[in-house]
Amino acid sequence: MTRLPRTEILDKSKYFHILTCGLVRENVFKEDNLKRFYVNAMAEKAADMGVSVLAYVVMDNHSHLVVTAEDANVVPEFMRRLNTTYAKFFNRIKNRSGYVFKGRYDSEPLLTAEQGESCITFVHNNPCAAGVGLF
C-alpha cells in the first residue's frame, strides 16, 4: 500500500505516532549520552515550534514519539530539525559521515482517542516488550 502524501495526513489529524529508525537498524542511540542529546534536542525543538510531546521512548536503534501541535503542518519541520540536529551530532562524535537514519521518519495519524491511548501505552511499554531493564 502506498503512503498518503503528508499534506493529506496533516489535514486529518493533529496527533501523530512517529517512528525514527537507525540506518539498517544500527544502534544510533546505544549510549546514554546519545539518548540524552536526542531527548534534549527534542524538548528544545518542540518548545521552539509549538509541538507537544505526549509520550516518547528512545531505544538503542529507534525512537517512538507521540506528538501534537495546534498547526499540524509544523510536525514535519519539527522532525526534520530534530533528526538533522541529531545526525550532525552523531556523525561528529563518531567521527563519521553519511546517513544516520533509515530514510525519512514514519508517521501515523492518531484519529481517535482510543488510537491515542493505545499508542501511548505501546510507547511506554516498548522497553519492557523488548526486554530492556528486566532482571
Language model features by range: what are they?
Residues M1-F135:
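Short catalytic/metal-binding and nucleic-acid-binding patches
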